[in-house]
Amino acid sequence: MSGAVDYSEMRFVDLKRKVVFELVREREREALKAFYKRMNETSVRLGCSKKTNFAVAHGMHHDRNYSTALDIATISCNAIRNHPLLADVINTKYYECRSRLLPNHCYKWKNTNDMIWDSSKCYYGVKTGVTQTAGPCLSVHYKSSCGTFDFIIVVLNSKTKEARFLEIPKLVEWAIQKIQRVKKINYKPSLKRQLLRNLAHF
């Protein structure tokens, strides 16, 4: 009959689509598993503790996705030292591009790290983030204008999104005082390393 719908064929097509969809989804799952495994292997290689584990790629909350301020600082330091392109991206204030599929559509991004807008020009990326359990978080690279001080400051579970940016200058001042104190006292190298490690845990 002209115009009649062949439901058996329609169901077969739907079945094929479902099979293809499941195959694609399974490959995606396997790819993500491999990616998580690689992330955790890399974190261990960089010297992160067992208190760090990655279980998602998007950065949102997951019960098996956790870390510490020291480990985040370790990862941040490696990123800016060994990946120049990433260092350039995280310090970009604005970026825009046009879609290949929609040439007239322009995408615009603004860096959410308020510290890179600071007039002192001593702050650089690294990462902002907020989840329900971790709260407002921030990893920042501080480098003094004279080049004397160069370190990473990490804030986790700040009271508000705005508060994390206000806490950074205070932590920088505190860290500089601690570092200067360490330099003035003639500690044994092992004790000095331990004091600096405690500083990173603050």
PLM region descriptions:
Residues 3-201:
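Penicillin-recognizing serine hydrolase domain
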